[in-house]
Amino acid sequence: MFSMVTEFMNYGQQTVRAARYIGQGFMITLSHANRLPVTIQYPYEKLITSERFRGRIHFEFDKCIACEVCVRVCPIDLPVVDWKLEMDIRKKRLLNYSIDFGICIFCGNCVEYCPTNCLSMTEEYELSTYDRHELNYNQIALGRLPMAVIDDYTTRTILNLPEIKNA
């Protein structure tokens, strides 16, 4: 008889302990219910990047001296620099510059070590395409100015908003 009483007491203690654990889990769930969502509705709302964000590389053709420092500091030897030596002025003349963003790891070494600051990181992060060969950007595509995150053509088109005028 005494064993039945102790088993009944143990059952009661286990029931109280289980109810306490369920209550703790429920309180954690309720505390998360009052928080703001972390995600954004991507095509309609754009992510505002931080100041040190490393996006697409912007290239200024006129500043480049074809020194190939960017190729030497790149961990994967990615930038392709084609140049020709001008014998009359004894300087290199840049013919072609390209970066394949399908392979680029966006480490920023090329931007950091460029002696003429012809390379810079932009806030542009939408580089997705259906064909991986479209990710190979030449100097014309690299020289294109980045589109502002706030004034995006696709968002304006989807939401039928007027174009933002720069003052």
From Swiss-Prot:
Positions contributing to [4Fe-4S] cluster 2 binding: C74, C104, C107, C110
Entry GO MF terms: 4 iron, 4 sulfur cluster binding; iron ion binding; NADH dehydrogenase (ubiquinone) activity; quinone binding
Reaction catalysis annotation: a plastoquinone + NADH + (n+1) H(+)(in) = a plastoquinol + NAD(+) + n H(+)(out); a plastoquinone + NADPH + (n+1) H(+)(in) = a plastoquinol + NADP(+) + n H(+)(out)
Main location: plastid
Enzyme class (EC, first level): translocase
Biological process terms in GO annotation: photosynthesis, light reaction
EC numbers for this chain: 7.1.1.-
Residues holding [4Fe-4S] cluster 1: C64, C67, C70, C114
Location in or out of the cell: Plastid, Chloroplast thylakoid membrane
GO cellular component, one term: chloroplast thylakoid membrane
Keyword Thylakoid included in the entry's annotation: yes
Keywords: 4Fe-4S, Chloroplast, Iron, Iron-sulfur, Membrane, Metal-binding, NAD, NADP, Plastid, Plastoquinone, Quinone, Repeat, Thylakoid, Translocase
Membrane topology: Peripheral membrane protein
Top-level taxon in the UniProt lineage: Eukaryota
Cofactor: [4Fe-4S] cluster
Domain 4Fe-4S ferredoxin-type as annotated: residue spans: 55-84, 95-124
Cofactor comment text: Binds 2 [4Fe-4S] clusters per subunit.
Keyword hit for Nucleus: no
Purpose of the protein: NDH shuttles electrons from NAD(P)H:plastoquinone, via FMN and iron-sulfur (Fe-S) centers, to quinones in the photosynthetic chain and possibly in a chloroplast respiratory chain. The immediate electron acceptor for the enzyme in this species is believed to be plastoquinone. Couples the redox reaction to proton translocation, and thus conserves the redox energy in a proton gradient.
Assembly: NDH is composed of at least 16 different subunits, 5 of which are encoded in the nucleus.
Family indicated by similarity: Belongs to the complex I 23 kDa subunit family.
HAMAP family: NDH1_NuoI
Protein name in UniProt: NAD(P)H-quinone oxidoreductase subunit I, chloroplastic
Organism of origin: Panax ginseng
Originating gene: ndhI
